């Protein structure tokens, strides 16, 4: 059994999201193992009984490296049963749980989400968590706090199109801040990629995000597109990222920078010697703002 590691970039609109993938490949057959994938099956799994046939498959996969659950809808009972199995899968590296709550009531989602997140808190090999395209709203941000605060091995966090709003965005950012504050002496943050677009984060949560980024200085990609962030928020984010010397990708597409925000970005640019992608499209830079960036 040959093991190989793949790190690839996938374009999404104007942004590039870093994806970490691990594969255990059988040299003879070429088939992949270590992956549980029910992506896009359109399953409606309400209870433990509904999900049991799939859990039987999951339990057989050893070691487990990835789960891909999107395009199905999971209820509280199903998530709790799934969580019981995931707790035992300490080799998990990629938890792709995007788009798993379509049609679920807002009263269901917090308990279901909490079960899944809490099951992964002690997973030291976990590197990527994707919870995008789930309609959490601000009320469902708190169930993620335990995972985001206490699992300090996560390198890639994707939370796009969740309806977090200012309150939910602040909760998530504060959890990341606390995670960094809990690092032991000499221990460095592992967080490298944060994707949190289409969440109406606005200026109200920008300061919390800036404070979090300032603690995770090894970060290489930040994508906060379509969030209604205005020039004051752009300034805060640039200041928070000023010590992130390894930053390679900054995507603030479809926010409102104007001339004032452009000044903040221009001032911060010398702090990012490795920056290769700066996306400020639809940010109302206008000619003066654009000129500042090119000077």
Across the structure, where does each feature detected by a protein language model lie?
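Leucine-rich tandem repeat or coiled-coil scaffolds
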Residues: 2-9, 13-295
